[in-house]
Amino acid sequence: MARQVPLNRCRNIGIMAHIDAGKTTTTERVLFYTGITHRIGEVHEGTATMDYMEQEQERGITITSAATTCMWNNIRINIIDTPGHVDFTAEVERSLRVLDGAVALFDSVSGVQPQTETVWRQGDKYRVPRICFVNKMDKAGADFEHVIETIRKRLGARPVAIQIPIGAEANFKGVVDLIEMRAILWHDETMGAKYSVEEIPADLMKKAEAFRMQLIETVAENDDEMLHKFLEGETPTVEELKKALRKATIDMHVFPVLCGTAFKNKGVQTLLDAVVDYLPSPLDVPPVEGIDPSDTSVVMTREAKDDAPFSALGFKLINDPFGKLGFIRVYSGVLKTGDTVLNPRTGKTERVGRLVKMHANKREDITEIYAGDICAAVGLKELKTGDTLCATTDPIALSAIDFPEPVISVAVEPKTKGDQEKMGIALSKLADEDPTFKVRTDEDSGQTIISGMGELHLEILVDRMKREHKVEANVGEPKVAFRETIRKASEAEGKYIRQTGGSGNYGHVKIRLEPNEPGKGFEFIDAIKGGVVPREYIKPTEQGIREALQNGVLAGYEMVDVKATLFDGSYHDVDSNEMAFKIAGSMAFKEAAKKASPVLLEPVMSVEVTVPEEHMGTIIGDINSRRGRIEGMEHSGGSQVIRAIVPLKEMFGYVNDIRSSTQGRASYTMQFARYEEAPRMISEEIIGRNQGK
């Protein structure tokens, strides 16, 4: 079967925003207008097509990125609906990695919110062109121009309006299209499916002309031909303007801004038109880069062509009753059911059992998938998030997806003996699906410890364990995931010599430890010369050091941002073995870490509190009492927004405290910012507690 939709008519987009800006509602409207659903699903009724997990329908939030395919004006659009809640950052990170473009939604009153900043930064990191949609224009206090200003100021981006609203709040009727200079009004009685194109209202004409001039001026800055016309006083044609705006958007010089209200069915069709007109097809983005698995210094590229060697990235896993579904984005070549593909991470080949196109939680079997498309594959047992799949004859390893480390952990134990084994299986399946969810066993207590990105994240995972895997568990109090690091360089040796009956054990290494850049993690350098430590014992030494990192020397927390150089050692012809060098590496590391001024690090959070003026003093005093630092304040609507950095340790239970101190009138959002050195008092308290004083 040949390709049905040419590559230039494909769009892979994500919908990204702060929680509650209306992402899922917007996607539901898109599915309705593109003819996929015959009834609009509502988030508040719990019937939204994209929110297909039970907890999503109960809580009215999107947890997993559901992928779906629809057609608009003969263009195939693959949409990934991403969660806006900070605890599910991993879902956003993995979606953006495989998208070509995105729609960023903004609340018409709040504008840029904390999670908007996070997802916007992730979009910048993966260089994803975006168009902006100011949603909820029917809301009291809606202010289109204020939102554009917050995009400019807080995101440092260049927004450019391609529409302006007609009316606002309850009187929001439609938009002025600044490209074609016409008014578009939606009819309520047709669920917004029909709209009329009219003359621009006289009272808006001047404003529309000023905004259009601004649009042409901004676009002309990046287009020589248009700049020349502009300076000559000529007006560009609609086609010229669209073409120049498309180029400027794909190059990320500008971000077109539209408006509407998805819930009231206004503005969705024009948003779809903009996706088609201004967001890139797989042909508009640079070829994907990777490395040669057999020689990591060789950089390779793959063009989005069907006749190129096959390459794809696995960006999401779902375990369901029918087996493991692996969502993949195909970058080059063609994949057919029954094909054998290579996973460079494992070095193993696997056979693709089935290929399915997903529509939220419904699926349609397909026989092949082409370059630039997204689908799910069944039968890939070894696939993990971020893995490359490629042709066995032309291997390539695409760059993996970076995920943040978990910041909070709780102990879980099964309620009954019978749940013990089931819990282990359930947790490993959940950890398979979610790279920011970690499971380990505490060496001292034997308890199972699960870690994640926040309280809601862990709560939902425990809930899924109960619903999907029928495992009842008791959950302990949440604990902060502290870390340890070092502040100066040191050297130490590890010597492991044991004589037991026949052959003995002999391992001897010398290492140099030094601080690594924050966020760089662990780095191992092999500086052995003259074979004083044979090649086959280098890897075991590194492994021993890596294992020792898991239990720091101060309070048993993982050590981060450390560089270890193996520079000397010795071996015994008969008694040396891998195990002896692994133990020697671990001993040397512990010894060196003790001498390298180890310190305790704690996660600090970026907190934003929206509070009425009269409660400002209370909130600021409370933040200071939690060891917080106020970073800035600004006016928004009738409230003040306070931005602060506060240690996570001090934020447990904040939701109840803030409610009671402001009679429920303040709200806050919080997300992980970074790790910072803990003050001495806190360090002593934690170290003392962990050493059982």
UniProtKB/Swiss-Prot annotation:
CDD domains: EF-G (cd01886), EFG_III (cd16262), EFG_mtEFG1_IV (cd01434), EFG_mtEFG_C (cd03713), EFG_mtEFG_II (cd04088)
InterPro entries reported in the protein's UniProt record: EFG_II (IPR041095), EFG_III (IPR009022), EFG_III/V (IPR035647), EFG_IV (IPR047872), EFG_V (IPR035649), EFG_V-like (IPR000640), EFTu-like_2 (IPR004161), G_TR_CS (IPR031157)
Pfam family, one: EFG_IV
Occurrences of domain tr-type G (ranges): 8-283
UniProt binding sites for GTP: 17-24, 81-85, 135-138
Main location: cytoplasm
Keyword Kinase applies: no
SUPFAM superfamilies named among the record's database cross-references: EF-G C-terminal domain-like, P-loop containing nucleoside triphosphate hydrolases, Ribosomal protein S5 domain 2-like, Translation proteins
PROSITE patterns: G_TR_1 (PS00301), G_TR_2 (PS51722)
A GO molecular function held by the record: translation elongation factor activity
Localization, UniProt: Cytoplasm
One GO CC annotation: cytoplasm
Keywords carried by this UniProt record: Cytoplasm, Elongation factor, GTP-binding, Nucleotide-binding, Protein biosynthesis
Domain of life (superkingdom): Bacteria
GO biological process, one term: ribosome disassembly
Family that this chain belongs to: Belongs to the TRAFAC class translation factor GTPase superfamily. Classic translation factor GTPase family. EF-G/EF-2 subfamily.
Record function comment: Catalyzes the GTP-dependent ribosomal translocation step during translation elongation. During this step, the ribosome changes from the pre-translocational (PRE) to the post-translocational (POST) state as the newly formed A-site-bound peptidyl-tRNA and P-site-bound deacylated tRNA move to the P and E sites, respectively. Catalyzes the coordinated movement of the two tRNA molecules, the mRNA and conformational changes in the ribosome.
Name the UniProt record assigns to this protein: Elongation factor G
